[in-house]
């Protein structure tokens, strides 16, 4: 029965329709896999077994009576950032202690309406602030991947580390995730899974705990490109409850898979060749270029001159927005309250006890750059630089480029409690150097597994597209997937 | 620009986060590392460049001005640490 958990969503869809097994059997297989693995991987922070069985039974009814929906009976994991009615929703923070929303996020509402089954809530960096899933109040997630012959625990990346680890370790068929600076694509690259951050405005942000509102976007992490397309189709919608939700119909992303890339122009930005990047990543990038060329795409060198300023601009814009969004955690309306002598001390004590170190650091930076006298020098300047970053991309696309190919991350997965990363916050931030530009410009980006390094750890490539042209990303990522093959961790857990 | 420990304490007060001497001193180092990193933005010529307000050009949507929601006092206070009859309870704020 354990093999059921190895099926992709497209396989599940076909086999459930053929009555090879029931949705309940599939859900039970996942629940038992979680029970065995979770103590070691810590991917789930809460498992909703009863709810999962109930939803699976309802799917079986549908499958029996006809009228199966697009994700009928597909067991999914949900990042703890998504509000799920009556179920643990804490953004993996202590400050949202015991919070159980009375409402459901739009993205998860869409998934349940399409017949998906909720297995539970997934671990993540606290408030999605981190690149290693080590800032979670619930402890780090362990990457199912290990070095060849080694037994050192590695990080799964972050902030959607639980989502990526659960998908890679066969603990859910697919997962929801969110990406503010690389939080879908970097963990996907670290775990040999596929992750897409769609265009800003494609998925509703309603009911997703806010980190940096002008950058946050939801997207799926999946086992392959097709599954990512199937999931995004369900997650995306036009939502009157989110004013930044864009009024464009959601296309059938799956239909783009398998389409030829002949004649497509793929841009290779020279600024992504950064100092200190491992030779293996450079080599993998070249392989990706060859694969695209072999498939008939035209390769063109491009320049995105403001690339190096994206990360510093991000570390002004994102903390500024976070400091404002996180002002709501005051010990009054929900979550943790720590008493004080007066109301101000109650606020200060609650926030000191409730927020972790990385979250406090970002609130402090954000408060500082927005404070009187510094706003122009920091925040306004960063937003002007952001305009320039976006303009770089616009010029490339205007010149006829259809998609841009880059490495997904500057390294493979690193060890948990890495001393260098812990000693220097900026070092950790550099993980997002290739992904953050995409958030700053609001564009879609997909990370697709492309190979293993000499230690046997996964590496990914990223494709960046025009706004609302996710279809070209699925089309091109599929070429890489077919050329590179799929990668699975050895089960040690 | 760099910050000293007194600035860090002032910012912590603005952010309503209690810090002790040790926290403030650690944060001073961390904040200065980050502020040092973002300093490179000063190299960029931003003359005449409009600050970004929205990544996707869009006009704010309008909706009909009608009541579509409400009467959920129970739901709204359900997660509060202390409530009484649909009110949030806070420490006394006026003498």
Curated annotation (Swiss-Prot), chain A:
Protein name: Glutamyl-tRNA(Gln) amidotransferase subunit A
Lineage, uppermost ranks: Bacteria, Pseudomonadati, Pseudomonadota, Alphaproteobacteria, Hyphomicrobiales
Designated gene of the protein: gatA
UniProt keyword annotations, A-Z: ATP-binding, Ligase, Nucleotide-binding, Protein biosynthesis
GO biological process, alphabetically ordered: translation
Pfam families hit by this protein: Amidase (PF01425)
Any one Gene Ontology molecular-function term assigned to this protein's record: ATP binding
One GO CC term, this protein: glutamyl-tRNA(Gln) amidotransferase complex
Catalytic activity of the protein: L-glutamyl-tRNA(Gln) + L-glutamine + ATP + H2O = L-glutaminyl-tRNA(Gln) + L-glutamate + ADP + phosphate + H(+)
Job description of the protein: Allows the formation of correctly charged Gln-tRNA(Gln) through the transamidation of misacylated Glu-tRNA(Gln) in organisms which lack glutaminyl-tRNA synthetase. The reaction takes place in the presence of glutamine and ATP through an activated gamma-phospho-Glu-tRNA(Gln).
Subunit structure: Heterotrimer of A, B and C subunits.
Enzyme Commission (EC) number: 6.3.5.7
Regions that span the bilayer: none
Similarity annotation: Belongs to the amidase family. GatA subfamily.
PROSITE patterns: AMIDASES
Enzyme class: ligase
Gene3D superfamilies membership: Amidase signature (AS) domain (3.90.1300.10)
Active site: 79 (charge relay system), 159 (charge relay system), 183 (acyl-ester intermediate)
Recorded superkingdom: Bacteria
InterPro entries with a match to the protein in the record: Amidase (IPR000120), Amidase_CS (IPR020556), Amidase_dom (IPR023631), AS_sf (IPR036928), GatA (IPR004412)
Curated annotation (Swiss-Prot), chain B:
Enzyme Commission no: 6.3.5.-
Keywords attached to this entry: ATP-binding, Ligase, Nucleotide-binding, Protein biosynthesis
This protein's record includes keyword ATP-binding: yes
Organism: Chelativorans sp. (strain BNC1)
Domain of life: Bacteria
One Pfam family of this chain: GatC
GO biological process: glutaminyl-tRNAGln biosynthesis via transamidation; regulation of translational fidelity; translation
Gene3D superfamilies linked to this entry: Glu-tRNAGln amidotransferase C subunit, N-terminal domain
Lineage per the UniProt record: Bacteria, Pseudomonadati, Pseudomonadota, Alphaproteobacteria, Hyphomicrobiales
Record protein name field: Aspartyl/glutamyl-tRNA(Asn/Gln) amidotransferase subunit C
Subunit structure: Heterotrimer of A, B and C subunits.
A single MF term (Gene Ontology): ATP binding
Catalytic activity: L-glutamyl-tRNA(Gln) + L-glutamine + ATP + H2O = L-glutaminyl-tRNA(Gln) + L-glutamate + ADP + phosphate + H(+); L-aspartyl-tRNA(Asn) + L-glutamine + ATP + H2O = L-asparaginyl-tRNA(Asn) + L-glutamate + ADP + phosphate + 2 H(+)
């Amino acid at each position: 029965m354990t093999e059921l958990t190895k099926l992709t969503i497209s396989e599940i869809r076909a086999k459930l329709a053929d009555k090879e097994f029931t949705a309940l059997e599939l859900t039970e297989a996942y629940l038992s896999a979680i029970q065995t693995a979770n103590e070691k991987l810590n991917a789930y922070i809460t498992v909703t077994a009863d709810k999962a069985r109930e939803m699976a039974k309802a799917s079986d009814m549908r499958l029996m009576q006809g009228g199966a929906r697009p994700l009928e009976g597909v067991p999914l994991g949900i990042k703890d950032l998504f509000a799920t009615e009556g179920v643990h929703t804490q953004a993996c923070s202590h400050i949202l202690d015991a919070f159980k929303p009375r409402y459901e996020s739009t993205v998860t509402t869409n998934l349940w309406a399409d017949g998906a089954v909720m297995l539970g809530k997934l671990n993540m960096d606290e408030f999605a602030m981190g690149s290693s899933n080590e800032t979670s109040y619930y402890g780090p997630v362990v990457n199912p991947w290990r070095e060849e012959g080694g037994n050192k625990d590695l990080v799964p990346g972050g902030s959607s580390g639980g989502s990526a680890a659960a998908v890679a370790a066969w603990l859910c068929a697919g997962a929801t995730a969110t990406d503010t600076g690389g939080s879908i694509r970097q963990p996907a690259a670290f775990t040999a899974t596929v992750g897409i951050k769609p265009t800003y405005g494609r998925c509703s942000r309603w009911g997703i705990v806010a980190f940096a509102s002008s950058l946050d976007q939801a997207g799926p992490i999946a086992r392959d490109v097709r599954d990512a397309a199937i999931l995004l189709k369900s997650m995306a919608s036009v939502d009157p409850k989110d004013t930044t939700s864009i009024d464009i119909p959601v296309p059938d992303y799956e239909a783009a898979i398998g389409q030829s890339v002949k004649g497509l122009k793929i841009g290779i930005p020279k600024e992504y060749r950064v100092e200190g990047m491992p030779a293996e990543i450079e080599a993998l990038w070249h392989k990706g270029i060859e694969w695209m060329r072999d498939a008939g795409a035209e390769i063109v060198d491009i320049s995105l001159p403001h690339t190096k300023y994206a990360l510093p601009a991000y570390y002004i814009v994102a903390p500024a927005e976070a400091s404002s969004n996180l002002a709501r955690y005051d010990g009054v309306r929900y979550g943790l309250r720590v008493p004080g002598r007066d109301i101000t001390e109650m606020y200060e004590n609650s926030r000191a006890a409730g927020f972790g170190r990385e979250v406090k650091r970002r609130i402090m930076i954000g408060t500082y750059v927005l404070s009187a006298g510094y706003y122009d020098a920091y925040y306004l300047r960063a937003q002007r630089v952001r305009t320039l970053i976006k303009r770089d991309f616009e010029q490339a696309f205007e010149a006829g480029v259809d998609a841009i190919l880059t490495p997904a991350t500057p390294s493979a997965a690193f060890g948990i409690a890495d001393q260098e990363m812990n000693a220097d916050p900026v070092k950790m931030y550099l993980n997002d150097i290739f992904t953050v530009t995409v958030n700053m410009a609001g564009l879609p980006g997909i990370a697709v597994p492309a190979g293993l390094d000499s230690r046997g750890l996964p590496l990914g490539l990223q494709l960046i597209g025009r706004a609302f042209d996710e279809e070209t990303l699925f089309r091109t990522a599929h070429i890489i997937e077919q050329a590179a093959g799929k990668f699975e961790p050895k089960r040690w857990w | 620009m760099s910050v000293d420990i007194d600035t860090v304490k002032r910012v912590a007060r603005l952010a309503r986060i209690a810090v002790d001497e040790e926290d403030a001193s650690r944060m001073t180092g961390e904040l200065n590392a980050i502020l040092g990193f973002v300093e490179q933005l000063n190299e960029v010529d931003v003359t005449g460049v409009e600050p970004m307000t929205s990544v996707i050009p869009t006009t704010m949507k309008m909706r009909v001005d009608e009541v579509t929601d409400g009467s959920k006092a129970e739901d709204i206070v359900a997660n509060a640490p202390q409530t009484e009859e649909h009110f949030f309870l806070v420490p006394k704020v006026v003498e």
